[in-house]
Amino acid sequence: VKTLKTLEEFLGKKAFAVIPVELGGFNTLAAVDVAARRGIPIVDADGAGRAVPEVHLKVYTLDDVPLAPMVAADISAENIVLIEQTRDSQAAEKITRTLAAEWNQTVYTARRILTGKQVKTSPVPNTLSTSIRIGTLLRKALDPLRAILKETKGFLLFEGTVAEAEHETKSGFTWTTLELDGANEDRNSSFKLKAKNEFLIAHKDGKLAAIAPDIITTVNAETGRCSSAERVKKGDKLAVIGIPAPSKWRRQKGLRLWKEVMQRSGITENYAPIERLTKRKSS
């Protein structure tokens, strides 16, 4: 709330609504909380249509919506930084990542000022309502995993048990490598995932199974509830699901932005749509 207030004071304007910066995890709920506390609407949309590893990796970047001016604060809001201008969105990413490293990996921000016209065209639409439907399925469906795959038009990539889990925090990121031994239909196979905060690439038996920007998610094999990369541990029984990325990310400009991030993350494989990589459908 303080970050938004500081940004409003700098601009001399009031916010009419809040949009989550990305979908999934704490960042979505933080936006809901701010909107509720301020008594203003939250838009049924977000800036990525998925969780992303870097601040500038938003569809707004594709639409040339500047990241700055931006306000960043630590978890207690005792330290508040106003960033009036940056060279580009990637420069802003480096600044906020440095702050995250100093502030125990947590930074609250208010950024990306959109006009009413931009709100209608730039964010990925209907993502909050989709999340609510998925939450309902997790609570009520007899087979939550299959229900989620059907709702998201996703793919079941693998089922198995975590044999190895490596986590390392450096430069403001949590790097994760997982190796799974197969179960059920995958009992004779192995699976490997790599993450930079978010899962970026997956291989089954050494062959590419999924790659960002398509969404790769690990979930509890029985309940369908998400197990985020940094929390997965050896012995966990997981299902790995893949979901096609929002259309903006699959266009040339979106893929080019992701390619830069992947190369910085040590991943050199070219993008291939998940539906071409697997024939194992949602049901």
What are these regions (language model features)?
Residues K14-E22, P41-V43:
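A short, small-residue-rich loop immediately preceding and capping a beta-strand
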Residues A15, W103-T115, P144-F158, S247-K253:
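Flexible, glycine/charged-enriched surface loops at secondary-structure junctions
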Residues V1-F16:
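Glycine-rich oxoanion-binding loops at beta->alpha junctions
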Residues I132-A183:
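Oxyanion-binding "anion nests"
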Residues L57-L99:
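A structural-propensity feature for long, helix-poor, extended segments
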Residues V21-V32, G49-E54:
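Short glycine/serine/threonine-rich phosphate/pyrophosphate-binding segments
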Residues E166-S283:
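C-terminal non-catalytic interaction/assembly regions of soluble proteins
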Residues R37-H56:
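Short, acidic/small-residue loops that bind anionic groups at enzyme active sites
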